Amino acid sequence: MPEIAQAHTPMMRQYLETKARYPDAILFFRLGDFYEMFFEDALTASEALQITLTARSKGDDKVPMCGVPYHAARGYVARLLEKGFKVAICDQVEEPGKSQLVKREVTRVVTPGMVLDDQVLDPREASWLGAVALEDGRAGLALLDASTGQLQCGEVDGDERLVDELRRAGVRELVFSSAADGARTDAIARAAGAPAARRDAAEFDRAEDRLRKHLGVPSLDGFGVSGLPLGLAAAAAALAYLADTQRATPRHVDRISRLSTDDVLLLDEATRTNLELERTLSGGRKKGTLLALLDRTVTAPGGRRLAEWLRYPLTDLARIGARLDAVEELTGAAVAREELALALRPVADLERLLSRLVLGQGNARDLRALAGALLALPALAGVLEARGAARLREAGARLRGLEALAAHLDAAVAEEPPATLREGGFIRRGHSAELDEIVAIAEDGKGWIAAMEAKERERTGIGSLKVRFNKVFGYYLEVTKPNLHLVPKDWERRQTTVGGERFVTPELKTFEEKVLTAEERRAALEERLFEALRQAVAAEAPRVRTAADAVATADALLSLSRVAAERGYVRPEVDASEALEIVDGRHPVVEAVLPDGPAAYVPNDVLVASRGAPECGEHGALLVITGPNMAGKSTVMRQAALVVLLAQMGAFVPARRARIGLVDRIFTRVGASDDLARGRSTFMVEMTETAAILHNATRRSLVVLDEIGRGTSTFDGVSIAWAVAEHLHDVTGCRTLFATHYHELQDLARERPAVRNLTVAVREVGDRVVFLRKLVQGGASRSYGIEVAKLAGLPAEVLARAREILKNLEAMEVDEGGHPALARGRRRRAGPSAAQLGLFGGGAPADPAAEDVAKAIRAIDLDALRPLDALNLLAGWKKSLE
């Protein structure tokens, strides 16, 4: 990029001066009806947006340039944000003059975490900026959603916990101090998966004083954030970033709350992913997730609130109970649900409307939408205040007090205002006597023009005569060439065109001065009136935000009650015990997508309690779950975790009965894949996640483990799985569901008092296997892998060879090295020490005759067996064993 002094034109000097202030952003520079980009920005943007790259002449050089239409800029900005770029919007802040350079200023900087445009934002997703203040071993975190004004802060120990919180919130952008260690901040940003900005360290200083001044309070004690120096430093930096990028004071951020992990159920990234809460494992889609199933909200804020509850389930019994009370009341009252839905429907997105208006980015349509939403609040309040549940009545009470603002906006703003303020006409007649007078002049002018046009046509005989207007010549009379001989001598020629000539008259000049003055006065007055209305809204920002919060809460409660009523969910009993008792539980998403409908789903019981809890003697603390592939082990375990999560977010659950002793954390280790970007194998990923569980699980945690150790050799895998299970039983003592294909782990029940064996039942009918999907007491003897392979369509010759190899393995044949033989003609494995069971407490070589009998028993169709046939079979088996 050239030096500013070398620029050939004043406009290019203006561009370079502006760009120098925003070196890390792509500068959208307004030129007429386009936003233009030059130099490196043009090269970057043209590639990212796949738009044409052209050039602007600069002496002998060509300046790279590209542009996008002003009216379509939103879509292009959104695409750049998706790719992690910042965009500085430089607008013309005065009308173009005839000779002087138009004044231009950056009106806002749009970054991935600083988006207010409703056409760019997902209406049902929060847009969090994460500001981070770092110290050795500890971090302060502030989450700010500029589009709603929500600000919260807290502190965590260690970067791993910090990243967990950043990913849980789904931050779009990070802010660090320029004084922070670069390697550390880069590692955090990579792990969080968000672009990062480095800001002046001064923005993190004197945080408490700056926050008190912004919030207009003598102390932050009332917000519950005292004693969090790092958290407050991050919050102050987040506010500074918002004010700087949006060129406005963020008055809509009128409160701050504590981001606490003490009263919420913690879910790490692996657990949120494995349970498919917001994105599916396959394809990362929203459809097919728990949130998609639960979201029956009417409003966008309600959808965002529901997602927040799903990310942050509670551990406070009183708060859980209050939500459940509200859901229970609405679940049992179909008429009340419909009334509430109808009352919510006219309520627009109060939070985001308020934010745009307060930050100076709103328009007349935003004012109209806000007026309509506020007018609907009294009716909504009445519906809520008539209910019995405390949460519903409280929400209703918080909707009061905005009637005057609603009436004021409704009386001031036209019913269907134009898209931009420049178009004018967005103020209702009767709101301003001065404006009404100016408008009358302008409208009378239209009639005057029509009358003059008719009069001059009659006087001159020029039937095609037109009175027209443009910004260069003002009003003029247009005459085509064939009629020029009819032009009167008192007309003054102004311009010759291809098709004719343009003239003015003294009468038309006088009219123009009068009308143009009126238009200028009208535009200026409408701008002042709009600003007054915007300030009136800003003055009521705290009340509007309170009402918006109440609307979101009521809508989220309605959504949970709709799902509960339609799907037959029940109210869970949530208490301080350490038991987990789910009777006839169902996986909420799986049952909803079954081709034959929810009735086809086979429910299951999950009964488990922490070791030492009164219920542990009956239920056990660690459930070893075995069974064939595809039998439903993973589904049963996931559904147990989802039932706990639903209960602690205050929702009804898919079960006949459920008792949930409070859980502090849910851990899941279900499936794995390579992490090539970080150089980690499948097994390394599996072991890393397992290590995190063993280090962080407590007695109150729920641990769900599926196929631990399968990524390595059989002996290594069994050894690791056994040791992990022992640790969870002996040391942690938490509620654990442990699915495995290592049938040796069933012997844990002989050695550990709180281990119970469960299996998913199957039925063999001839050479077919029927999966019953039912969890029953006992263990499995086979995994039926070959049968599943057959269902998957493996070639017959491959299946036959697999059966042959399996037969050798089951006969305990070994090769010369003592390993299971995969080919025929090997010697039998000798001695008990060679058997895998010997690793954990004794085993004996297999008896071939007994194996044959067992195989025959497994092949029997009991439903078709007559009593006499059974006796004959028994006699034959007895004889063979003797």
Swiss-Prot record:
SMART domains attached to this UniProt entry: MUTSac, MUTSd
What positions does the entry give for ATP binding? G627, P628, N629, M630, A631, G632, K633, S634
List the GO molecular function terms: ATP binding; ATP-dependent DNA damage sensor activity; damaged DNA binding; mismatched DNA binding
Highest taxon above the source species: Bacteria
Assigned keywords, A-Z:
ATP-binding, DNA damage, DNA repair, DNA-binding, Nucleotide-binding
Q: Fetch the Pfam families from UniProt.
A: MutS_I, MutS_II, MutS_III, MutS_IV, MutS_V
**Biological processes per GO annotation:** mismatch repair
> What's in the GO CC field?
cytosol
Q: Which residues form a coiled coil?
A: none
Question: What is the similarity comment for this entry?
Answer: Belongs to the DNA mismatch repair MutS family.
What the entry lists under PANTHER family is as follows: DNA MISMATCH REPAIR PROTEIN MSH1, MITOCHONDRIAL, DNA MISMATCH REPAIR PROTEIN MUTS FAMILY MEMBER
Role, per record? This protein is involved in the repair of mismatches in DNA. It is possible that it carries out the mismatch recognition step. This protein has a weak ATPase activity.
Q: Write down what this protein is called.
A: DNA mismatch repair protein MutS
* Protein's organism: Anaeromyxobacter dehalogenans (strain 2CP-1 / ATCC BAA-258)
